[in-house]
Design a protein with these regions (language model features):
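Hydrophobic alpha-helical segments and their helix-loop junctions in multi-pass secondary transporters
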Residues: 80-107, 123-138, 305-314, 339-350
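Helix-loop-helix module between adjacent transmembrane segments
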Residues: 12-67, 123-127, 226-231
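C-terminal membrane-solvent junction of multi-pass transporters and transport-like membrane proteins
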Residues: 74-77, 245, 251-268, 284, ...
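Loop-to-transmembrane helix boundary motifs in multi-pass membrane proteins
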Residues: 11-12, 49-53, 164, 168, ...
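Extracellular/periplasmic helix-exit of transmembrane alpha-helices
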Residues: 136, 140-143, 167-197
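Membrane-interface loop-to-helix entry segments
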Residues: 54-55, 63-93, 294-299, 321-325, ...
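Transmembrane alpha-helical segments of multi-pass small-molecule transport proteins
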Residues: 16-19, 43-65, 81-85, 89-90, ...
């Protein structure tokens, strides 16, 4: 799609979009590596930087030597540990009336910190790298299906899968927010300063066990490590897909390293660049939030570009967006633009 759009629109637009995604993803990779390093530090008495370095090497080895698709289907089960937040939310009995009321009518303030978190929340929901990863993975799955003699996935099937996946993802995010807010506030913790602080949100789930705090840390660490093993290759891979599109290189995680050296070289460089950010001693929690804010800001021009591309029959053929899709895309663009602008003004006036 990028290559096709570059034939219609200015290549400056193409390179600008790719540049934004590369910057955002490298920052995200660095933040994710730092988060996993902190999670490993909860389990083993090793320095965070050493843990981050070992983890980075493991990720690259698995992605290149084993193949992402070969191990990702097993690692998905590690992500089930995030269900602990759903169960914990039920255990702690929050005031559900207040929760639902706050979801519908949030208490808005004009402080910079408030809008910083709002833009970060948008950045974790409208993840720019997924524009590249999702589209390319669908193409790769179609190729795999053709090789195996399986029926091709229809657009209706793809749309249904995306709807189900995004619904589950967002429900999981909501429960994580509810659980963390309720449990940490009950314990007088107003700010998360470390991975250990974040892990305390799961203590009610294991409070009947001896050393409940230790079990909470283990649960939290398993979830973070699993998501890191799944997410970092996606971030690095989407960088490589984006750059490969501009260079018309052979691309795809179904190829071996010897078959797509340039594609994998970009993955290695993007992952290494993210790891280098850890050398300067970034705080894992602050880095994750900052990376999400960058995602939120980068998503503004990308959403508008998707709106333009999806409405252009020269790019989409007969599959242009319908009225509902166009309306939702335009609304998303306006909301993200407004939140980004308010954040900018609030930071300047602070």
């Amino acid at each position: 799609m990028l290559f096709r759009s570059s034939e219609i629109y200015s290549k400056k637009i193409l390179y600008s979009v790719v540049g934004l995604v590369v910057i955002a993803n490298v920052i995200n990779i660095g933040a994710d590596i730092a988060a996993v390093g902190a999670a490993l530090n909860l389990l083993f008495p090793v320095p965070i930087l050493l843990a981050s370095t070992i983890f980075t090497l493991v990720v690259l080895f698995l992605e290149i030597a084993i193949g992402y698709h070969a191990y990702a289907k097993f690692l998905k089960f590690l992500a089930l540990s995030l269900l602990a937040y759903v169960i914990t939310a039920i255990i702690v009995h929050p005031n559900w009336g207040e929760v639902f009321r706050s979801l519908v009518v949030p208490q808005i303030t004009w402080e910079a910190n408030y809008w910083y978190v709002i833009v970060a929340l948008l950045g974790t929901t409208i993840s720019p790298y997924m524009f590249f990863w999702q589209a390319t993975e669908e193409v790769e799955e179609q190729k795999y299906a053709s090789k195996m003699g399986l029926p091709r996935r229809t657009l209706r099937t793809i749309r249904r899968d995306n709807t189900i996946g995004m619904t589950i993802s967002q429900l999981g995010s909501v429960f994580m927010i509810i659980t963390t807010a309720v449990v940490l506030n009950q314990n007088g913790l107003k700010e998360i300063g470390s991975a250990a602080d974040a892990a305390r949100a799961l203590e009610p789930l294991v409070q009947g066990f001896p050393n409940a705090g230790t079990y909470a840390k283990i649960l939290f660490a398993i979830g973070i490590i699993g998501m890191g093993l799944l997410g970092i290759p996606v971030l690095a891979g989407s960088v490589s897909y984006a750059i490969s599109d501009t260079r018309t290189w052979r691309q795809g995680l179904d190829y071996k390293f010897s078959q797509a050296k340039q594609f994998y070289a970009v993955i290695i460089l993007a992952t290494a660049a993210g790891w280098l950010l850890n050398i300067i001693g970034v705080d894992p929690i602050h880095a994750l939030i900052f990376a999400a804010v960058i995602n939120g800001l980068v998503s503004i021009p990308l959403v508008f570009l998707i709106f333009k591309l999806s409405s252009d029959s020269r790019v989409m053929g007969v599959h242009t967006s319908g009225p509902l899709s166009k309306t939702m895309l335009l609304l998303t663009f306006v909301v993200t633009l407004a939140c980004g602008a308010i954040l900018g003004f609030s930071l300047l006036s602070a």
